[in-house]
């Protein structure tokens, strides 16, 4: 509808109580669009693919209760968004791949009270270097100090790229580290992986998370974890239990 309207700066939404869908690419390429109050759109359910990609939306964004899903790359490249609040969005069910990709100043995403959110694609937060915390606790996902897990804490899904901690010990409940669960984080210099971890999925440590910068990974398990693909630790400092270095190399 407004695709590539490069001089559009604001959309007045006063009294807009029946709008249910914002279609794919609706405001894509509106590079100066900064005024758009989603909290007024009480009937809004769906935001389509790349609907607001590369717009100038900025600051804190809050959604009303009716939103159910955000499409692929819906807000990708919105570099000035600093936080997203879904705490009133009790019907939210789907966050798609790339939804907030390249939102370089995004620090916090709040999913508290999103009891129906059952599809949270971790690729939604690709290349969000400032992200410090994801807040959620429902029947599908939970977070501890901003770190995202499945609800039983058996799988660690995302350690945010902007989290400010020099060291982190993975909880002993964790059995699996998910794909791209540890993006590059310049603050994190020491990661301890407990014996409970049995599976590390492909590219768990990506974008050079621990490579060539002095950061170290401490493996507590004596028996090496079997790997079928690259996890991204090829050039990292990895410490293993004394006497088991050969087993890890093999």
Spans of model-derived segments:
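Consensus positions within tandem repeat domains that build extended binding/scaffold surfaces
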Residues: 1-3, 23-28, 48-51, 71-76, ...
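Short, aromatic/basic amphipathic alpha-helical patches
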Residues: 229-232, 246-250
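Predominantly extracellular/luminal carbohydrate-interaction, adhesion, and secreted-enzyme modules
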Residues: 3, 205-206, 230-233
């Amino acid at each position: 509808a407004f695709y590539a309207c490069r001089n559009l700066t604001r959309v007045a939404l006063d009294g807009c109580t029946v709008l249910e869908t914002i279609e794919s690419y609706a405001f894509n390429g509106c590079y100066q669009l900064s005024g758009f109050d989603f909290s007024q759109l009480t009937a809004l359910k769906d935001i389509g693919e790349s609907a607001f990609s590369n717009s100038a939306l900025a600051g804190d964004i809050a959604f009303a209760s009716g939103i159910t899903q955000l499409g692929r790359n819906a807000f990708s490249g919105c570099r000035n968004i600093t936080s997203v609040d879904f705490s009133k969005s009790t019907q939210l069910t789907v966050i798609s791949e790339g939804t907030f990709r390249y939102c370089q100043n995004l620090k916090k995403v709040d999913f508290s009270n999103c009891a129906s959110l059952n599809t949270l694609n971790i690729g939604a937060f690709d290349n969000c270097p400032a992200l410090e915390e994801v807040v959620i606790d429902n029947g599908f996902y939970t977070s501890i100090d901003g770190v995202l897990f499945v609800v039983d804490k058996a799988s660690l899904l995302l350690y945010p790229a902007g989290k400010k901690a020099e060291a982190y010990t993975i909880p002993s409940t964790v059995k699996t580290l998910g794909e791209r669960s540890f993006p590059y984080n310049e603050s994190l210099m020491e990661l301890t992986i407990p014996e409970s971890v049995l599976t590390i999925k492909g590219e768990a440590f990506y974008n050079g998370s621990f490579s060539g910068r002095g950061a170290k990974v401490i493996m507590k398990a004596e028996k090496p974890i079997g790997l079928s693909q690259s996890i991204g630790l090829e050039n990292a400092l990895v410490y293993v239990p004394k006497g088991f270095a050969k087993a890890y190399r093999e």
